[in-house]
Amino acid sequence: MLYICFCVLSVGGPTEILTTSFVGGVRGVEETGFTLGSFGEGGRSFVDDLKQVSSASVLSAVAGGIIFNLSNILLSASTSLAGLSIAFPVGCGLALVLGVVNNYLFVGGDQGDPVLIFSGVALVMVALILNGVAAAKKGNGEASKETGNAASTAKKGVVLAIIAGVLMSTFYALVARAMDVTNFENPAEGLATPYTAFFLFAVGIFVSNFLFNTIVMKKPFEGEPVGYDTYFKGKLSTHMVGVLGGCVWGLGTVLSYIASGKIGASISYALGQGAPMIAALWGVFIWKEFKGSKSIVNILLSLMFVLFIVGLGMIAVAKS
């Protein structure tokens, strides 16, 4: 959640923000591996674990990073087109729903009470629908103010958010499959600890970033093409905020993978997907994206917040 706040504060284009934050993320993952992943009495150290990981586990974790990176780039583009309070709840919310199902079905270990998990997911789905209705009513209210191009741009942003959400729903399970989720202290041979799996995941992000960012910079979804010189023209303070956001994201994500060994991948993944609420809060209260909307829009947004929080709460207690 804090990662989103730092990235929003890191003023710049989506590619500049993501590149800087991912540099911070890789750096944070490296430090985590050589500290938390290497100290202690039990289990394999980070370096020893990295040496024995099978090629299948490496490919799975790296593929998760590549997919995550692509989904984030598309989600950032959708945010610039449709607005933060619309794009993030749609993209991340869809990723939450599909991701929970994916992790529950395809990742081993005790996943918790399916009734509570999928009831929580159902509430999140209703919250997403309410968000879409609120966005539509807001759009109808502003129809006289917007041009056809503006409406088309917003729709394009929503489509990108949906694609990003579908892609994002798959990355967690790919990384989890590279780990022995039933025994983090002494993982089976060829499988990784959370620290090693997340390092490989971050490598996939970093390497693919050069390809994906180059394409998006040359063929942007909106605006004029830019070069890498634009990135280096940015202020150091701007880059450092992005790096800090990446470090926060890296620490939060590796803790999520560690937690999956105790509470199950589907629950751990869901609890790490509180991003839509923070994004919606920023969109509503900071950027005033719904300012001047009808009272029904405000009611729908309030219900969305309540249902999303209750849904996450049900998922959180599913293991107990």
Locate each region found by the language model.
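Polytopic alpha-helical membrane proteins, predominantly small-molecule transporters/carriers
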Residues: 1-3, 30-320
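Short, well-ordered junction/capping motifs at the entry into regular secondary structure
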Residues: 4-19
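Short, small-residue-biased leader/transition segments that mark boundaries at the very start
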Residues: 15-29
